């Protein structure tokens, strides 16, 4: 019984402090940029996150609008201007903006570029 209580406390702690999202973001940024000195790069990112949190200034994420558009266009190989919900969810996971256990609701509509950009930008601000 004690183990499950500890596991529950650990899970609550990780969720409360958004640790999974931060680790996922750090991993995505590391793989996106592939810096020569990964440990120094991660320390720098964490410091910038801390400064952004303390000052209330938006953190400059690695995904600007041109990157978001490029990612969308790769998924929209047919050029229809939409992607499927599955592609959308996988893109959010790849970017570290969605956890495995997050329950995203599929409303049955295709995802447009504007919707994709809006959601990616919104979620990046929440990190």
UniProtKB/Swiss-Prot annotation:
GO molecular function: calcium ion binding
Domain of life of the source: Eukaryota
Database matches in Pfam families: EF_EFCAB10_C (PF24548)
InterPro entries tied to this protein: DD_EFCAB10, EF-hand-dom_pair, EF_EFCAB10_C, EF_hand_dom, EFC10
Record's signal peptide: none
Gene3D superfamilies: EF-hand (1.10.238.10)
Protein name: EF-hand calcium-binding domain-containing protein 10
Residue ranges constituting the EF-hand domain according to the UniProt record: 63-98
PANTHER family: EF-HAND CALCIUM-BINDING DOMAIN-CONTAINING PROTEIN 10
CDD domains named among the record's database cross-references: DD_EFCAB10
């Amino acid at each position: 019984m004690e183990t499950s209580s500890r596991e529950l406390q650990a899970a609550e702690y990780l969720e409360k402090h958004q640790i999974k999202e931060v680790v996922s973001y750090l991993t995505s940024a590391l793989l996106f940029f592939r810096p020569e000195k990964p440990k120094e790069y991660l320390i720098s990112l964490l410091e910038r996150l801390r400064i952004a949190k303390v000052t209330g200034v938006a953190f400059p994420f690695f995904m600007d609008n041109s990157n978001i558009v490029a990612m969308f266009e790769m998924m929209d190989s047919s050029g229809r201007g939409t992607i499927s919900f599955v592609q959308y969810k996988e893109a959010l996971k790849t970017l570290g903006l969605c956890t495995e256990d997050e329950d995203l609701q599929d409303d049955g509509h295709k995802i447009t570029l504007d919707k994709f950009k809006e959601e990616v930008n919104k979620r990046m601000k929440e990190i």
